[in-house]
Amino acid sequence: NAIPELLHDSGVGGVIDLDKVPSDDPSLSPLELWCNESQERYVLGVPAARLAEFAAICERERCPFAAVGVATAEQRLVAGYGATVASVYGGSGARGDVPGPAPRGGDPDGQGGGVAHEALSGPAPHGGDLDEQRGSVVHEALPGPAQRAGRPDDLRGSAAQAEIPVSGPRAQPAGVGEGADRGGASASAHPIDLPMDVLFGKPPKMHRDTVHPPVPHWPELATRGLELHQAGLRVLAHPTVAAKSFLVTIGDRSVGGLTAREQMVGPWQLPVADCAITLAGFDTVAGEAMAIGERAPLALLDSAAAARMAVGEAITNLCAAPVETLDTVKLSANWMAAAGFDGEDALLYDAVRAVGMALCPDLDLAIPVGKDSLSMQAQWDDGASDAAPASAPAHRSVSPVSLVVSAFAPVADASTQLTPLLAREADTDLWLIGLGAGKQRLGGSVLAQVHPGEGALPAFAGPVPDLDDPQRLRGFFELVRDARRDGLLLAYHDRSDGGAFAALCEMAFASHLGLDIGLDGWGEDPFRALFNEELGAIVQVAGENRAAFADLVERHALTECAQRIARPTTAPVVRVIEGQDVLAEWRWEELFDAWWSVSHAMQKLRDNPEAADAERAAARDFAAPGLKPRLTFDPAEDVAAPFVATGARPKVAILREQGVNGQIEMANAFERAGFDSFDVHMSDLVAGRVDLAGFRGLAACGGFSYGDVLGAGRGWATSVLERPALRAMFAAFFARSDSFALGVCNGCQMLSQLKEIIPGADGWPRFVRNRSEQFEARTALLEVVESPSIFLRGMEGARLPVAVAHGEGRAEFASAIEQAAARVALRYVDGHGQAATAYPLNPNGSPEGITGLTTTDGRVTILMPHPERTPRTLNLSWAPADWPAGSPWLRMFRNARVWVA
């Protein structure tokens, strides 16, 4: 689809030479070559006059590409082996190359790898210029030698415009060139030759005749006879409700340095956040919020209600972010169904009509994007019965109609976000704002799923939760917005799977607090009250603000929806109380173990089982201090200010290699401290375009150079050590008394393997696979150890949270003697300030928590964590409320500016 869609959006046609499409498999037929869904392939439309400029970009980035065709004024698509404008539109019909220079690759060193880019270039339609007529779609960067970054946004250098994104694998193997017989097709064949309207013209509307399926004969849950204590444990252990930490910690959530809210919340770092927030830039608090809603199980009973609930849940999740108006929210709808299966088409129609023709228009919500997957069924025969007819497969799996809604909205000030972390004030209440307005429907609920009915079937049936009044959702949104604006809310968590009980427990887990849950006036049935999954949220309000909050609820016409339901306590106990009676009581650890059970089981199967056990033991410790920072300096003090005021801006090379992805945030950190950051690719050094002699500092950035296939950082380091000119350049730089260097993450791994040419680096370890046998992305607590490091002067003794993201961060010393001689600069510690030796406080298993080292004179420092991603307090997953806007980690970079003086 990529090439035709790009041409169609530009109002042109194209001639594509299939011989030019890179492929490692010469046997592919034209159909397979054209229609396979290879990943990481991008199409770019490049003006022919600028193809050489584009080729230079690819060469610098070690990125293979191929020019595969030309755009034409006639809206006609032609693709074939040897297809050219001349062969299609006249002339001899012989093959011809794409007009303009058409290099076949951008990997001068022969190292391959990376993402291949195919460039679709050619004459502009109607004799004009594509840039002028169609506008620029993609901007590629071509920094000159050591081009000054200026602002981090300028790190890419001067932009070369390119229209249309494509790509392919590496260049063809030897012997597969023009004229080769691919899949039996003749070299001159044009297997694709058709007007663009055939692909993109308006097709006739599809008409389908379908009927609703019969109502499922599941039993309905009868709460009489259920045991409340056991029900709470079962609900928390259900995979839908249970903790998802095992999924969260394997994904890098801090890369880019613009994250303002990720899944983990609070000093104990539990994955209970309602939404994600990213910042729009390095110098603003404005940004974007994202949230998801889905209630697919309800579609088994009522597909329209399930769709409305998905939209509603996306909005209630998004309310944790400071979104100003509902009309700024945009939705993406991902529809899934088993089209053609008995009755599913009718259910899909019900769901689409409910959302697209009723709910969203009522709320002025737009759904500008989305996708559909309408083949959500599979059938197979296990071969047990050879006599079974082909029309009756032995097994069939059919997915219910499902809608996953992603909501996006701008936020003006990300610092005013709300999380489920409860404030530890003496007098606070937890209020439930329930949009069911007293309805407590249990159909399709997790409570129903964990209690079998007749014949061991889940007691799943009954009325399902629904968004009965769309304007009530609008009132809820505006209530939360106004209460936040007035400073009335201390914490927020939406009610969803598992009901209010699950939401309350997650707030208690994240805060290491107990709860007294009061049922007075909340309904006659404690099971329906606690476990119904109607839309809503729980908010924490200080006692002194009760009246103001109640008044605000009344002004938004939600009085019948709001009720005080719980109070936080410092005891490790959760109780459900009605009047003077305690209906159920759980130990905090008992509930937490149930909630953590799924994550622990999955982690134990996937990772080092000992690490999974250690994390569970640490997470369930109610008395654990969590992240407990300690400052030994004033982070608000800008020690570099006098030197920055002189106007001098020393030059720092922001060094990267193929696969490195942390250069933007590294440049930002140095720029904020008064340096000039320059984007330096290793290919610049290899080609002689840049020399390190022109820089005072060097920063080797994080990422995955060469995909870590030779070991983290090893390929990068070897590319220096095995090239005499580069080895001499780096050795000369490190030998200078006026130079400094910083290596972070992949850069740390790389510099550690250059220690033979770094004076004073004797005893540095190499960094190997984490003890957990897994990539670890967490917020950890670091202590600054007394050392010669120029980056850490005046920070000694401080304990600071920092982003961690690596798979090979365990320091491995050649001997105990070398470890004793190593100049340790940073180490992981626990909340008590002791060296962290246990997982996950020590996320990689390094001895004595060692994670940062320096040289004898302190000019070169390496560390595995990412201080450059957290130069602002807002970048930290959690920080004390009284910290200034500038993170303590900014002092590192300011110290370097002071040293350069």
Whereabouts are the PLM-identified features?
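Short glycine-/acidic-enriched loop or helix-start segments at secondary-structure transitions
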Residues: 54, 441-442, 549, 664, ...
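Cysteine-nucleophile active-site neighborhood
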Residues: 704-789
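Glycine/proline-enriched, intrinsically flexible loops and inter-domain linkers
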Residues: 1-90, 179-697, 701, 706, ...
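Intrinsic disorder/low-complexity segments
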Residues: 87-188, 390-391
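Active-site glycine-centered loops adjacent to acidic/histidine catalytic or metal-binding residues
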Residues: 494, 745, 866
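Short acidic/polar capping segments at secondary-structure boundaries
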Residues: 49-50, 73, 84, 436-438, ...
